[in-house]
Amino acid sequence: MKALLDLFKQVSQDEQFDAIKIGIASPEKIRSWSFGEVRKPETINYRTFKPERDGLFCAKIFGPIKDYECLCGKYKRLKHRGVICEKCGVEVTVAKVRRERMGHIELASPVAHIWFLKSLPSRLGMVLDMTLRDIERVLYFEAWCVIEPGMTPLKRGQIMSDDDFLAKTEEYGDDFRALMGAEAVRELLRTIDIDREVETLRGELKATSSEAKIKKISKRLKVLEGFQKSGIKAEWMVMEVLPVLPPDLRPLVPLDGGRFATSDLNDLYRRVINRNNRLKRLLELKAPEIILRNEKRMLQEAVDSLLDNGRRGKAMTGANKRQLKSLADMIKGKSGRFRQNLLGKRVDYSGRSVIVVGPQLKLHQCGLPKLMALELFKPFIFNRLEMMGLATTIKAAKKLVESQEPVVWDILEEVIREHPVMLNRAPTLHRLGIQAFEPVLIEGKAIQLHPLVCAAFNADFDGDQMAVHVPLSLEAQLEARTLMLASNNVLFPANGEPSIVPSQDIVLGLYYTTRERINGKGEGIFFADVSEVQRAYDNGEVELQTRITVRLTEYERDEQGEWQPVKHRHETTVGRALLSEILPKGLPFTVLNKALKKKEISRLINQSFRRCGLRDTVIFADKLMQSGFRLATRGGISIAMEDMLIPKAKEGILAEASREVKEIDKQYSSGLVTSQERYNNVVDIWGKAGDKVGKAMMEQLATEPVVNRHGEEVRQESFNSIYMMADSGARGSAAQIRQLAGMRGLMAKPDGSIIETPITANFREGLNVLQYFISTHGARKGLADTALKTANSGYLTRRLVDVTQDLVITEDDCGTSHGYAMKALVEGGEVIEPLRDRILGRVAAIDVVNPDTQETAIAAGTLLDEDLVDLIDRLGVDEVKVRTPLTCETRHGLCAHCYGRDLGRGSHVNVGEAVGVIAAQSIGEPGTQLTMRTFHIGGAASRSALASAVETKSNGTVGFASTMRYVTNAKGERVAISRSGELAIFDDNGRERERHKIPYGATVLVGDGEAVKAGTRLASWDPLTRPIVSEYSGAVRFENIEEGVTVAKQVDEVTGLSTLVVITPKTRGGKIVMRPQIKLVNENGEDVKIAGTDHSVNISFPVGALITVRDGQQVAVGEVLARIPQESQKTRDITGGLPRVAELFEARSPKDAGMLAEVTGTVSFGKDTKGKQRLVITDLEGVSHEFLILKEKQVLVHDGQVVNKGEMIVDGPADPHDILRLQGIEKLATYIVDEVQDVYRLQGVKINDKHIEVIVRQMLRRVNIVDPGDTEFIPGEQVERSELLNENDRVVAEDKRPASYDNVLLGITKASLSTDSFISAASFQETTRVLTEAAIMGKRDDLRGLKENVIVGRLIPAGTGLAYHIARKDKEALEAAEREAARQLANPFEDAPVTVGGEPEAPAADTPSDDSAE
């Protein structure tokens, strides 16, 4: 025992390990951990408070209570270390061992481990191939189980009830053996021959073809192979020995008043011991079977609730009826071991306080209250006091500090100098939520924060608190300074925009200064330089906004790269001239020579960063802030009631709207419109009226009349305070001003529907009681929404971080030339995101070629920065193939070239950057800004969306996309017959400017290659009906068109015209009526054939179509045969905001998903079933594929149409899994990126595409084995992509067949749980299931990701930690090689190790180089 302990001691010093392995403990293993058996349920003696011997807190088993002191007090002090007292049997050692020494309980009857029984799918059930219900009946003594059938016809593992058992015993006597309880299960497990089972199963797999069977067999096979590979015996799932947790981990604490607080585990252990002891006694007494059975069942239940209380049956409860916390509850959930103690620890040397604004600070500084600093830097102060000889001991130093002697403050100043501290504001949503600052000591108790970093922390000064942490070691200080100092983090990692942008007062001050006023005092004066302007301003000769001309000095670089002053004359204003003083060298004055709004200032800082570098930008931003504050104070801008100008036109607009509403009401009462239409119209009218009032108000606010110096009256931009605040972007928006001075407009009910009577008043006029009451709904809903949103957004971020946490840049270049071709993003003919924004900061995958000269303009592998992107713009290249994280070929992690620019630093990404976590934070951080609601599109909203034509927005040449197909009709019009036709407009350089979708049946008004001017109509169509157009000419022949059966005649009351409407066919007497269709016949009476085939043209009509041709009528190409009214489309609910993002990342299939064509081929319709129509696609080989489609679904294709694989054939939202299967990874990535971006763009949030791509890469990291070839995999098994590629490489190297596979798209939760690392998965969700599975497979965690390393308490393999881990591995390899060399030298005649395939044999398990820790 003692030898074992020494071994333990030595391990604890030098914790070098490379992996952690998990398995099932064998009874021998448990006994070897144990320091003695716990025999009694007693805990401590109630009088002496000493632990009882052999009890749950026994000192003999677990170690002494006090350091170096045995229980009876015979041996005390250090000199007796290691002695075992002969009186009380306690070893004299540190009391800390009570945290690590375990005991054990010898169970009188075996007990099944509940995790392997009840954690679904039941592992016991899988191994034994029995149902959970049957195993439970055996375990809880309700049934017998046959162990050895002997010569009888019974089967092994057969279940029989008591009566059956008695009958069979009478019949066969002792020929067979049957048991019940855990003994039976253990016997079954012990006698199972795993190797033979595996072989049988593999044989069955090859033989069977039924899907369900394959699935079942491969699941069982996986579990059995797990046992086989890991060397874990199946019978260990049934326990004979129960380990006992060290007592200090389940403490018993005396409270005052003689009561005790105890851990629930002690209760649970006590029950187990009591029942176990009772069972032992009953066995000795040879008690009747029925009593024993009952006692064994109770023991099983007691152990169950100790391991996982409440998993089976009713949970055990304590005295106060609350469920006891079992071992499983200790580790899972938010307050379990993983999330509470391992992933989130509280740290020393930290404090928190309220923050106040510190405008006098520099960007890298923060104000730290003296008292706080004194406490935080104590150890450093003690050290300095001792070095200076002012204190001899730590105690003396402590006294000095506590009495706050004057010398202490001087020392504090010294200690703090250049020692950065880290400030953190919760919630820390992205990496800018923790930044380092140099502390400046201040009086008072509040931390001072620099105003410009508030945006990054999302902090304001209404009572926010922040925490301070002190980095202690030199390395930590170094990293805090170089990587985390606020002045080094001036860009948002999400989009590369500056994060130190001025806001509010600063913006207002700068805006007010840089505005111009017509006819200001001293207008038109010429000044020689800025100092002259300053003098004139100080003497009151000019005002801030006066327009003047001034000569300014700017700096430009000459050939040598030196700054040369250049003088220019500028027409500008006084304020702008004064501001020009703070411009950094290298920025021209033109960037300042305009009214500075928030967006302009952001652009200014961005330009400064790109042109002048980090240092100058930080200084510039600081100066901008100081000027802004000063000038805002000088400006004295304030708000008065008079500033809210109510537009004069308001009354007229309201009167007109009321009149229109009355008109609609009249129509409704006379029955012309339905109530729904009336409601939609009313809402629409008021909505428009509200917008009109708002517009009139803004027009009135925006300008004011002034007299210029020539005495003419002109209008200039207004100096109205409210308008200036909104216009500059300092505070408020047009919508808010509209509520102050226009009208509040329409309000929503709690259920989201709009109340049709609007609030016509504004806040200046005041609301009446009804109006006030209506407004309360919206306000309350807003608050409730916010609370929900925060929780949901936090959970999304957690899942995202978990799925990407192990993605780190691990190498510089993977050498791939794959990538995605990036184009400008065009929607509805408008460029939403230009090409330059999409490729900025990426690496070119192939050479970018100048389209005019065909020369290489930019070589492959170049990082595209601002200058190169400008060049691409100038060259007119409209498509660039760039590297992307999705095509990166690095096995573990990503390479720097595929990722491109690190957005938060503005330069090439470094090896070791944790790009996964950054991506997750960038997507999760704006989550709280997204909406939570589902939009009902319909009613008023969708009417305006019915476009009926497209027009060009720019001059250029028309180009038809390859998908565009059309026919020319008799009038010479082009009629589109493609479902996904697109038109593009190209400019003179041949660059695509815009792209428009042309619906089926539209009249195309321009030709391919035609030059058009802006505003030209390209195509028009009827938005309310969808036509069916003939692609061939001939005479119409009706088929199955019978009045009253498949069609009905409709007569229009007004015009008297009759049309045929297709109705759902009535089946008469079991005769199945085919769908109504027409064929075309040529002059000879033969069917017209589809070009190039021998299919005849037949056009079938869906229900609801209006047939516009007559039987026998001649039709020409492009003529309309029928119309389908479009309002039949139901209004679809569109999921918006946060739920939509979550839905995309969870890869959920939408409920009415559209259907994509599985193959390329020709469409035809087969026989319909009752509720479904049968669609057949005949592929190019002539094989037909059938699909059944619900009748109410809208089919987008018609008979004889040729469709491409992956084209949408039934309308509905797309299913990402289908896109992946039929169109491949690139299309899927584009789909997810675009859809996620749509949600964020709606809220005005910018996120770089590559963050979303990184997440998609992680969602695609597993593959499905189709054919295992000569590999070890099982068909249908899901494995890590990297594992599969490695295995395939190995097999190919041996000239065998590699495995073939399909890509699998996993949602983020699924992907997190299916990672290689069981530690990471267990700490995320479903802890029990993950650990159970890992234990059976005997999994080994190589600690690759960040999370696993945090949990085991090592440096994470990212950033500086990556270098540390690489160096450590290299050093270990070197040492191993040196040891080997030394051994070779020592005995030169020993044979070299046998090598197989060029690799030395793995060392035996007991050699020290096996680095796995149990």
Swiss-Prot record:
Binding residues for Zn(2+) 2: C814, C888, C895, C898
Catalytic activity reported: RNA(n) + a ribonucleoside 5'-triphosphate = RNA(n+1) + diphosphate
Region (Disordered): 1378-1414
Residues the record lists as binding Mg(2+): D460, D462, D464
SUPFAM superfamilies: beta and beta-prime subunits of DNA dependent RNA-polymerase
GO CC annotation terms, alphabetical: DNA-directed RNA polymerase complex
Keyword Cytoplasm recorded: no
EC numbers: 2.7.7.6
UniProt superkingdom: Bacteria
Note on cofactor: Binds 1 Mg(2+) ion per subunit.
InterPro entries: DNA-dir_RpoC_beta_prime (IPR045867), DNA-dir_RpoC_beta_prime_bact (IPR012754), RNA_pol_asu (IPR000722), RNA_pol_N (IPR006592), RNA_pol_Rpb1_1 (IPR007080), RNA_pol_Rpb1_3 (IPR007066), RNA_pol_Rpb1_3_sf (IPR042102), RNA_pol_Rpb1_4 (IPR007083)
Cofactor(s), by name: Mg(2+); Zn(2+)
Gene Ontology process terms (BP): DNA-templated transcription
Binding site for Zn(2+) 1: C70, C72, C85, C88
Keywords: DNA-directed RNA polymerase, Magnesium, Metal-binding, Nucleotidyltransferase, Transcription, Transferase, Zinc
Pfam family, one: RNA_pol_Rpb1_1
A GO MF term: DNA binding
Assigned protein family: Belongs to the RNA polymerase beta' chain family.
Oligomeric and partner information: The RNAP catalytic core consists of 2 alpha, 1 beta, 1 beta' and 1 omega subunit. When a sigma factor is associated with the core the holoenzyme is formed, which can initiate transcription.
Function: DNA-dependent RNA polymerase catalyzes the transcription of DNA into RNA using the four ribonucleoside triphosphates as substrates.
Name of this chain's protein: DNA-directed RNA polymerase subunit beta'
Gene symbol of the encoding locus: rpoC
